[in-house]
């Protein structure tokens, strides 16, 4: 009437012979960027741009092979903001970020060092953002508005250093 079940020869659930998952590795990247200001009769103004994430930021980008950090920062200000006559003043520091790439590496974990430099532009410098370089809008903001204009909290120490240097007359 009832068929007898054969006893199992294993002790516990059957497991597939899967190798352990490899450790999660991050892609390392180095970028360089600039905080650009100009001295106006009514005070200092800094350039900010609307980036591909819809946030106000500063120009930055990957350092190309054979290129130094300051040269990369100057090139990025030219490509993203159209500023070709800027004067390098000072190294501002580095921020270290981790994120998931959504453009080139599609979800890859990225560990990026971003080096920032302080540049001075000519008084009559105009901003010409380039959407092809992920700079969708750009504007000059006063030093008082700079903290509110920057959308990224990790930029606070860099902004503080830039403002202190400009205040000292560098």
Predicted regions and their residues:
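Active-site segment of metal-dependent pyrophosphate-handling enzymes
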Residues: 82-124
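Conserved Nudix-box catalytic region and its N-terminal flanking loop in Nudix hydrolases
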Residues: 42-84
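Short aromatic/basic micro-patch
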Residues: 57, 111, 140
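Short, solvent-exposed loop/turn segments that connect beta-strands within catalytic domains
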Residues: 40-45, 105-107
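NUDIX/MutT-family hydrolases
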Residues: 116-120, 127-159
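Acidic, metal-coordinating catalytic segment for phosphate/diphosphate chemistry
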Residues: 1-41
């Amino acid at each position: 009437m009832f068929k007898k079940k054969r006893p199992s020869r294993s002790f516990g659930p059957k497991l597939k012979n899967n190798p352990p998952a490899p450790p999660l590795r991050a892609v390392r990247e180095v970028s360089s960027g600039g905080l650009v200001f100009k001295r106006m009769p009514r005070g200092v103004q800094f350039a900010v741009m609307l980036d591909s994430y819809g946030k106000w930021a500063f120009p930055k980008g990957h350092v190309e092979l054979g290129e130094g950090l300051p040269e990369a920062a100057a090139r990025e200000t030219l490509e993203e903001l159209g500023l070709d006559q800027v004067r390098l003043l000072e190294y501002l520091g580095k921020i270290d970020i981790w994120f998931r790439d959504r453009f080139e590496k599609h979800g890859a974990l990225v560990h990026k060092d971003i080096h920032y430099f302080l540049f001075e532009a000519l008084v009559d410098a105009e901003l010409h953002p380039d959407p092809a370089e992920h700079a969708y809008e750009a504007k000059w903001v006063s030093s008082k508005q700079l903290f509110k204009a920057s959308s990224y909290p990790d930029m606070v120490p860099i902004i503080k250093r830039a403002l202190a240097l400009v205040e000292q007359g560098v």
